[in-house]
Each structure stands twice: as structure tokens, then as C-alpha cells.
Amino acid sequence: MDIKIDISISGDKFTVTTRRENEERKKYLPLQKEKTTDVIKPDYLEYDDLLDRDEMSTILEEYFMYRGLLGLRIKYGRLFNEIKKFDNDAEEQFGTIEELKQKLRLNSEEGADNFIDYIKVQKQDIVKLTVYDCISMIGLCACVVDVWRNEKLFSRWKYCLRAIKLFINDHMLDKIKSILQNRLVYVEMS
């Protein structure tokens, strides 16, 4: 006698399905593959840790999206708190965001293109790109996203992803990830 039991766990709820129920369900559902794999993308907003399996490009995408749409008035975890500290590095390297806002006319129709052109020029001016240049660039993008959010240009956060891809390669993203991991461990230990 074969007994098939499927167990589905979601949060604090679980569902147990027996073989007979499976057979009944198959009659009414459209054709499906026998085995499906669900990919669950983590929500980094309230993350306190950074694991080796986490992708920095995905984390930055979520960071810019949240910051561009909601700002920092929402509750966020230690990971986003550490990334927010990159804003200070950006101001040290690039000057205040108000100066750049005027210089690049960020609020104009051409503001997004002006910003991308500025990023390209910055990359060309750097002889040897360091991880700290990249950290400053992440901070700069976050500050620019704030400007656009305040002007209700909510969809422009995606331009910051493009800027990051132009400026930072995968090797540097891995270095930034290591720095963030070390900072998070240090904060946890103190």
C-alpha cells in the first residue's frame, strides 16, 4: 500500500495533503510538471546579516528601490543601516548632494541622463578603481535616489542600478560584500 503525503509549510501555517487528495486535485488543475521548484527571493529590507549566498546586486536593487519609493522613514535592518553609511563617503568624495543636484540638473527631464554621463566621466577619471570609490558611488546613487523621490520621480531609482553596473564590476561587489559582512559581525559583537 502506497501512501503519498505532501507537506507545505508557509510561515506559521502548514498544509498536509494525502495521496487521494492529490489525485482529486490533478483532475481539476491544468497540466503541470510533476516537480516544480519555487525560487524564493529574500526581502532584504529588515535583514540584519549578510550571507555568502546573498547577491550584492540584488541587495542594492532592493536598497535603491525602497529608498527611491519609500525613503528611510520605514523600519529597516542592520544591513540597510550599514549601506546607508555609504552616504557619508559619497559626500566626502563628490561634495554635497545639493551641489550635484544643481550641477547635473537632476530634477530636469535630462537629469537621469546627466547623472549617467557624470558616472561615466567619474569612471574615466579614476586611474585605479578602489573599493572605497565603489562604496562612495553606492552612497552617491542613494543620495540621488532621495532627490528624485522628493521630486516624485519615483521610477528613476532604476537609473542608479544602471550607474552601479557601469561603475562597479562583480569583483568589487564581492569586496564590498566582505566589508559589509565584517561590519555587521563587528556591530553584532559590540
UniProtKB/Swiss-Prot annotation:
Key words, A-Z: Host-virus interaction, Inhibition of host innate immune response by virus, Inhibition of host NF-kappa-B by virus, Inhibition of host RLR pathway by virus, Inhibition of host TRAFs by virus, Viral immunoevasion
Database matches in Gene3D superfamilies: dsDNA poxvirus (1.10.437.20)
InterPro entries linked to this entry: Poxvirus_Bcl-2-like, Poxvirus_sf
Transmembrane as UniProt keyword: no
Pfam families associated with the record: Poxv_Bcl-2-like
Function text: Bcl-2-like protein which targets host toll-like receptor signaling complexes to suppress innate immune response. Interacts with host TRAF6 to activate p38 and subsequently induce the expression of several cytokines such as IL-10. Also associates with host IRAK2 to inhibit NF-kappa-B signaling.
Family: Belongs to the orthopoxvirus A52R protein family.
Name of this chain's protein: Protein A52
